[in-house]
Amino acid sequence: MSSVPQIKIPATYMRGGTSKGVFFKLDDLPEKAQVAGQARDQLLLRVIGSPDPYGKQIDGMGGATSSTSKTVILAKSTQPDHDVDYLFGQVSIDQAFVDWSGNCGNLTAAVGSFAISNGLVDADRIPENGLCTVRIWQKNIQKTIIAHVPITNGQVQETGDFELDGVTFPAAEVQIEFLDPADDGEEGGDMFPTGNIVDELDVPDIGRFQATFINAGIPTIFLNAEDLGYQGTELQDHINSDATALARFEKIRAYGAVQMGLIKDISEAAARQHTPKIAFVSKPKNYTASSGKSVSETDVDLLVRALSMGKLHHAMMGTAAVAIGTAAAIPGTLVNLAAGGGEREAVRFGHPSGTLRVGAQAELINDQWVVKKAIMSRSARVLMEGWVRVPGDSF
């Protein structure tokens, strides 16, 4: 029987926001995996434990959910006036691919902490006490993100009293600024790729829906909960235990992706699970969060439920929160209308685990909506650091 020895790679397992992922420094990866391509993807798949037909990722670091099947590669930035280049890979659980089409807003909260602790931020920029401003170049979406990381006695402060719904224990607050979050790249173009703040989306054998398509933080399709037969108060099990509902959402997402210009044919959606996201909104209602916490309609401006990688998210994706804040700031979008309409610079929304506040500054310039930045607070913590091992013939 042949035997292939395992290799070990320096890695850090971190929580960022309501997600967890395996973090690497680019130059710690095996040489073949230091460049984009098949070797890198195969390595990350093996690290996380995919593809797994059992859907459990038992033989890897993944947690068998969209929030925990994630990888991050960081390097000293090659961009002027930036500290760190941040590349995010969303690893499919049951299929053999890594989706590089978008960012993870939750893990963004951990990028600054990792960069400081691993020598990617110049030492003269790190205060003895206070906030360290880490300038992040997000390579997937070619955008600048600023993380304000608390420092105590020259070290990253991870513990604190900041509470984040969806995370059990309090931690230190990390404020994140997503600068110019609207997509202006080759895929999707403007913030509103169709040129409209509300469109009609026709989905064969499903129905016709009002939709807001937006490229901000991450490409997102917003629908009205009532049009789908929902209240907006649903928790994970209500949606994720309904295979018919999940298939319907995926079909709507595929047709929406075509209308947004992200793919040319609905058949391409299966290999692009990370983007676009699909979410549904409703006016405030009383509900009980997954933790048992009561959320009153007076606590929030609107309710939002979002799907990631084919399942309802347990809380809210960080990038989708940017999309929510941006859409809420622009009068007439479905998100804005669910929040009561009008102009606003911040919104607090209810999600399955509780509530979240996100701010965005929008203005109309030459008949085009422009958002200068979106702001939200998360937290981050190192869970484990050392080496991750994979069979030497994995890639």
Where in the sequence are the language-model features?
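A glycine-rich beta-to-alpha transition motif near the start of alpha/beta enzyme domains, typified by
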Residues: 1-395
